[in-house]
Design a protein with these regions (language model features):
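Acidic, S/T/G-rich, low-cysteine, solvent-exposed domains in lumenal/extracellular/periplasmic regions
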Residues: 225-227, 234-257
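Non-transmembrane functional regions of envelope-associated proteins
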Residues: 2-224, 253, 257
Length: 257
């Protein structure tokens, strides 16, 4: 093809590309809010798949799986077992431990187990526990549901565990700050990072620099959210090394896990 013809063809492709981009921008501008959520989610999901990366070598999951339930029995389990698990994990000197189980009530059947678990949490000095938002009779709207006081005092940190799925049921983001507007909780993942890296950005107490938006039925509510972040997934559900609860409890995992 002559050079002049190639130049004209390239110019036409450039012009068509600009036109297509302008039309897409116009469609996005004219579309009602949320109308392009599907395409946006598709593009985001494809981008995350393209950016899949190896799991961080310092992150390990301990799962309450079917084999553990078959061996130990149905849930809930005795808190003495959780205390033993924490002791086993803490012996490996991890940077942080997230125990994503809410212990908001005393154990009526085995009250001595509460003391054992609190002692294991305190001895570790690395355990973060979850905080929930509850809206039911007996709790004010948006009130936090915390672990028992003995567990709260023993824990190195608390963090909220709320996520809001998109319209298609997929969780693509979370709020790093959520809770009572005057003192929101960090997300549990951020709480874990701050235990492991206390000098990391956002780990020191800071005054709120962004406005908090109240959630609920449109009227001001005590529960608020802040700092929405997209989740940069490293990979699929089985991407991170995962060990069975019962195997960890029995010490049947590699010492360098």
């Amino acid at each position: 093809m002559p050079k002049a013809a190639r130049t004209r063809a390239q110019q036409r492709r450039f012009e068509w590309t600009l036109l297509a981009m302008a039309l897409l921008a116009l469609v996005a501008w004219l579309s009602p809010p949320g109308q392009l959520a599907g395409p946006n989610h598709l593009i985001q999901d494809l981008g995350l798949r393209a950016l899949a990366r190896p799991p961080h070598p310092d992150i390990v999951l301990v799962a309450v799986d079917d084999r553990s339930i078959a061996t130990i029995g149905r849930w809930p389990w005795r808190r003495a077992l959780h205390a033993q698990l924490l002791q086993t994990i803490s012996a490996q000197q991890p940077q942080a431990i997230g125990l994503d189980i809410l212990f908001s009530e005393a154990d009526a059947d085995y009250p001595q187990d509460d003391a054992l678990l609190a002692q294991a949490i305190a001895a570790s000095q690395r355990v973060a526990l979850p905080v929930l938002q509850r809206n039911y009779a007996g709790l004010a709207e948006g009130q936090s549901e915390l672990p028992l006081d003995m567990f709260t005092q023993a824990a190195a940190a608390l963090g909220h565990v709320h996520v809001a799925p998109d319209g298609d049921g997929v969780v693509r983001g979370l709020y790093l700050q959520e809770g009572p507007a005057d003192a929101p909780w960090s997300h549990l993942s951020q709480a874990l990072q701050c235990i492991a890296q206390p000098h990391a950005q956002g780990c020191k107490p800071q005054a709120l620099t962004e406005p908090l938006s109240a959630v609920g039925n449109g009227s001001p509510a005590p529960w608020a959210v802040r700092q929405h972040e997209l989740i940069a997934y490293a990979g699929g559900p089985a991407h991170y090394p995962t060990y069975s609860y019962i195997d960890v409890l029995r010490g049947q995992v590699p010492s360098d896990a």
